[in-house]
Amino acid sequence: MPSLAASVWRGILGFTCVSIAGFAPWALAGRWFHRTVGEAGLYTVCALVFIGLSGPLLHRLIIGPGSLARFYKLFSVAFAAYSVAWIIGWMSLRGHTGSLVGLFVGTAVMGWMFARAFGAPETAIKAIAALFVLNGLGYFIGGWIEGSVSGLKDLFGVALQKSARMTLAKLLWGICYGIGFGAGLGLAFHYCQASARACCRELSPRSDSHPGDW
């Protein structure tokens, strides 16, 4: 079974990869998507990429057999709810206020759904706090980096065209977002499965001697 540190690292590494792919439609073809399907359509496409790629990279955050199907069943609904809340908050209020409101409502819904799915409602507050704080840090630090890099005339002495700078800046935002949200997911899943891990240890007291098996 994964330790707390292992869950966090799995979340960071897995979701950072997912996030780079999820930000790619905006970074590489944002204007085309805006013209073709609009802002909400672009965010929907990004959300579908996040959901579709999350399973292979993150399903081992769930302990026990059948983790891939169980992960998709839970995460697809939870991330869809999170995305809807964020999109509504952002498009209604805009700016940092819209982002904060969307992030809080979205992560609150996600954390509650995780806790309920694992029959551990007492862990909801911890899961929500982990998701909101770490997601928020990754999002806003990434936004600051995106703004800084997009305004540079050169990077490490290498001149970059504006389009290249903008693409790089957006992908760097995706990396920061992935690190923060991934860490939050690792913590949230670990918190919500505390009872399940305790039961597994009682049923298999020697399992801790094989930490690499999970």
Model-assigned labels for residue ranges:
Residues 1-214:
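Juxtamembrane/disordered regions of integral membrane proteins
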